[in-house]
Amino acid sequence: NNVPATPWGAGTSTEGNPVPTFGGLVINMSRMDKILEIRPGDLQVDVQPGVLRKELNRKAGRHGLFFPPDPGADATIGGMIANNASGVQTVKYGATKDYVMKLTMVLPTGKVIHTGCKAHKSSSGYDLTRLFVGSEGTLGIVTEATLKLCGIPSHRLAATINFNDLESASGAVAALIGSGLGPAALELLP
């Protein structure tokens, strides 16, 4: 009926996206908050869009696993998918798009579709899953997702390094990445 629908998750709104600028309905997805199944042997989890990232990592952590994208705020998985959330760990782990394997979506017409698959490698057909990730809810609303998980690192080390200028800092970052140490997070603070 040409009524705009805007999905809303945890309201972290770091991007300002859940504002219905053209009127219409705001659909609160926060009660669709079930972790449907964790499959440790497959490094996968099935979730509803209202699951909070910290809650997912708490439950996956019981199996020695975690969902790496960390936008800073405790966003919902649906919001992270809608915005292709990333964070300081992107340098090693990538963004949300790198972990979404399968989606169940409701299109603006009301039609329910399934994209992707649970196989780690699939090269047949169009990659509709990647089309929806980062579309900010404009192409449809996520109602379920299958995500890849990673093993929790056995060791962690944090360091703060001061530099006199940006050139020295960027040179050190390039050297660190080139060394093969594989830092999980890097952040430049003024």
Tell where the protein language model's regions lie, with residue ranges.
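Short, glycine/charge-rich beta-strand/loop segments that flank catalytic centers
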Residues: W8-N17, P71-G78, L188-P190
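Glycine-rich N-terminal segment of FAD-binding domains in flavoprotein oxidoreductases
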Residues: N1-M32
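FAD-binding subdomain of flavoenzyme oxidoreductases
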Residues: K34-I38, V45-E187
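Short active-site oxyanion
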Residues: N2-V3, L43-V45
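Gly/Ser-rich phosphate-binding catalytic loop and adjacent alpha/beta segment
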Residues: N17, P40-G41
